[in-house]
C-alpha cells in the first residue's frame, strides 16, 4: 500500500486542479451565468468589426474643401450621420450662424468620436449640433443606454479642449423602417435628455413632436422612398425647432 500512495496522491491532486480550473472557466463565463451578457458580448463584437476608417475618404474630402474655402472659426458645426449628410441646404438654412455641415455616411457615434479632431475640434466652433446614434441602434444593435454613454464620451472630448462650446443633441428620430427599435430610441432620448439637463453647455433638441401625429403615429410622409431618410418636408419641420434652440 505504501508503494502506491505517492501515485494516488498525485492523481488526486491532478483531478482537484482540473475541477478547480474548469469550475473557474464556467463560473466566469457570461454565457453560463448571465444570458443577457452573451448579447452584450455579441454587440461589442459587432462594434469591434466596424472599420472606423470606412469614411476616411469623406473626411478627407472635407479637408480638401477646407483648403480651398477656409471656414471661419467660432462657427456652428453640424456633425453626425447621413441625416446631415443628405441635408444639402443645411449650410444655407443656417448661414447666419456660420453653419458647417460635417455629416458623413451612415456614421455611428464611435466614428464621430474617431474623427472628432478633424470634423469638429479643428474649427473651434461656438456651437456643435449633434445627430448620431440611430445607426448605432438600428445597425449595430446597441441599446439606448450605450448610445447615451457614447454621447457622453463625445461631450467629454469636446469640452476637454473647448469648454465654452455649446453642444446640442438632436433627439433620436425613429424612421418607418426602424419602428421595431422604437423602445431603444425612447430610452436613449430619456437618458440623454436627463444628461443634458444636468450638464452645463449641453442641450437637448426634441424634434419628436413635429415628427408625429396628435395620436402619436409617425408621419411617414416625411420620409423618402427608402423609409429611412427624411425628405424636404421632414427637414422643413426641423429648421424652426433647431433655430429656436440655438437662439437661446
What are these regions (language model features)?
Residues 1-11:
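Bacterial N-terminal signal peptides that target proteins for export
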Residues 9-21:
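Bacterial N-terminal signal peptides
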Residues 19-35:
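Signal peptide processing junction and immediate N-terminal pro/mature segment
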Residues 31-58, 72, 198, 236-248:
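Conserved catalytic region of serine esterases and O-acyltransferases that act on ester linkages
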Residues 44-153, 176-186, 190:
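Conserved SGNH/GDSL esterase-like catalytic core that processes O-acyl groups on lipids
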Residues 117, 121, 133, 156-163, ...:
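Sec-exported extracytoplasmic/periplasmic mature domains
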Residues 147-170, 187, 191-202:
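Charged, glycine-enriched surface loops/patches
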Residues 174-248:
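Catalytic His-Asp segment of secreted/periplasmic serine-dependent ester chemistry enzymes
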